[in-house]
């Protein structure tokens, strides 16, 4: 069953039109409460397959399923009402063929009510992007560092540091742009390359570890909120330190339970006489 809201949301076309106007603001969201908090402040929320690592403790995003993405897409739609919501196509749900990609993407849109899907890939995925867009499915592209390919690319590292990598990013970005993506995530890409493709593409670029030269920025919300003490990529800034705050709150709760000071009289139901 689709999850619909009555208020008018920002659309993929709205996001695309922001290029050259002002920076585009985006974050990931996976749950209803977080979506509700982020919705007033962002242009679009990405229900990213990063949820596999952030919420489920997986080592990579490869183990994320289509059913997982749909469930979390529904949750984010319930918690948001004004921003555009984009849901990731997970690994294995679109690479086989453009027809498989359409079936997966159509299911996401119908069952979540979201506005668009995101897929990773460069020139090799351009035909798929064009196929989806021509059939009414807006696509957010993703070039540069591609987490779904970590098993074949040798890990998480920035790209664009040699001529071969620069040529590939240029080719990939242009192909996805020409295919009709409404915006393109550029991940883990050195600043000169990010600046160059941002200046040449029709679609806005959304950077994550790709410098302020991009048309907008996205971060994993759990990263920027400081929920992980043992993991902080160079491109992440902690805008809050929630991990120690949560730890302290739980410690205080445990101490009060053990001391029988919680629940207090104000938290207890009484019989009225």
From Swiss-Prot:
The keyword Magnesium applies. GO terms for biological process: pantothenate biosynthetic process. Keywords: Cytoplasm, Magnesium, Metal-binding, Pantothenate biosynthesis, Transferase. Its main location: cytoplasm. Mg(2+) binds at residues 49, 88, 120. Pathway: Cofactor biosynthesis; (R)-pantothenate biosynthesis; (R)-pantoate from 3-methyl-2-oxobutanoate: step 1/2. One of its GO terms (cellular component) is cytoplasm. It is an enzyme of class 2 (transferase). GO terms for molecular function: 3-methyl-2-oxobutanoate hydroxymethyltransferase activity; magnesium ion binding. Binds 1 Mg(2+) ion per subunit. It is found in: Cytoplasm. The active site is at 187 (proton acceptor). Pfam families: Pantoate_transf. Its cofactor is Mg(2+). It comes from the Bacteria. 3-methyl-2-oxobutanoate binds at residues 49-50, 88, 118. It catalyses: 3-methyl-2-oxobutanoate + (6R)-5,10-methylene-5,6,7,8-tetrahydrofolate + H2O = 2-dehydropantoate + (6S)-5,6,7,8-tetrahydrofolate. Its EC number is 2.1.2.11. Belongs to the PanB family. Catalyzes the reversible reaction in which hydroxymethyl group from 5,10-methylenetetrahydrofolate is transferred onto alpha-ketoisovalerate to form ketopantoate. Homodecamer; pentamer of dimers. This is 3-methyl-2-oxobutanoate hydroxymethyltransferase. It comes from Sinorhizobium medicae (strain WSM419).
